[in-house]
Design a protein with these regions (language model features):
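ATP-binding N-terminal substructure of ATP-dependent carboxylate-amine bond-forming enzymes
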Residues: 1-104
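Conserved short-loop catalytic and cofactor-binding motifs
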Residues: 7, 11, 107-108, 130-133
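Active-site nucleotide/adenylate-binding loops and adjacent lid/helix of ATP-dependent enzymes
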Residues: 110-201
Length: 201
């Protein structure tokens, strides 16, 4: 076992900051040198990581990341945002003894992870904790799912199947006014949500 590790936390969602903080505050901290990169200026990351680099946009960054990892003797590369672009180069990173962490293994698994409903079913099939969900494609299916879930749970939420995990997430409630949607982007009157969804058809 090595006595020291160089790890690289590449562009991620808001978790990038959290991951670096957790590593810095962990028992592993004395044994780690943390490199990180982002395609935008992120001063808070510069303050946290041992080294910060401006990286190309994710879809253009696999070659750049590989070169940087080789140059700085990186043992582990974590990619948390649009990591399917990096996943395609897993074997190349492995050839240079760089462990690649992208949240999934293989392009097909990345597609599964991006589909939140399918990902929930996969977790359930593996007996991993997951939140019960229904996938709907029409307003009548939405109404039926809402009725069913309101009978089973005191609080229900809705979110798009694809996209950033927190984006579009909304808690539905019969007891809030339509105006609440202008005050909170995460709380919506149930009927208002149904009416808005119906306009998509």
């Amino acid at each position: 076992m090595k006595s020291h590790y160089n790890i690289w936390i590449a562009e991620s969602y808001s978790c990038q900051n959290d991951i670096i903080q957790l590593l810095k505050n962990s028992n592993l901290s004395p044994y780690l040198t943390i490199f990180c990169s982002h395609s935008k200026q992120r001063p808070e990351l510069k303050l946290l990581a041992d080294y910060f680099f401006q990286q190309p946009v994710i879809k253009d960054s696999p070659d750049w990341l590989l070169e940087q990892c080789k140059k700085h003797s990186i043992q582990l590369l974590f990619c948390g945002k649009h990591s399917q672009f990096i996943e395609q180069f897993r074997e190349e990173f492995s050839r240079h003894d760089i462990q690649l962490v992208t949240g999934a293994r293989g392009i097909s698994q990345h597609k599964n992870v991006n589909n939140k409903f399918l990902f929930g079913q996969i977790c359930e099939g593996l007996n991993l904790p997951s939140i019960s969900a229904a996938k709907v494609a029409h307003v009548n299916e939405l109404k039926q799912a809402i009725d069913e879930y309101q009978q089973r749970y005191s609080v229900i939420c809705a979110k798009p199947v694809y996209g950033v995990y927190g984006a579009g997430f909304v808690q539905l409630s019969d007891d809030v006014s339509y105006f609440m949607k202008f005050q909170s982007n995460t709380l919506c009157n149930t009927q208002q949500f149904i009416e808005a969804y119906a306009q998509l058809e």
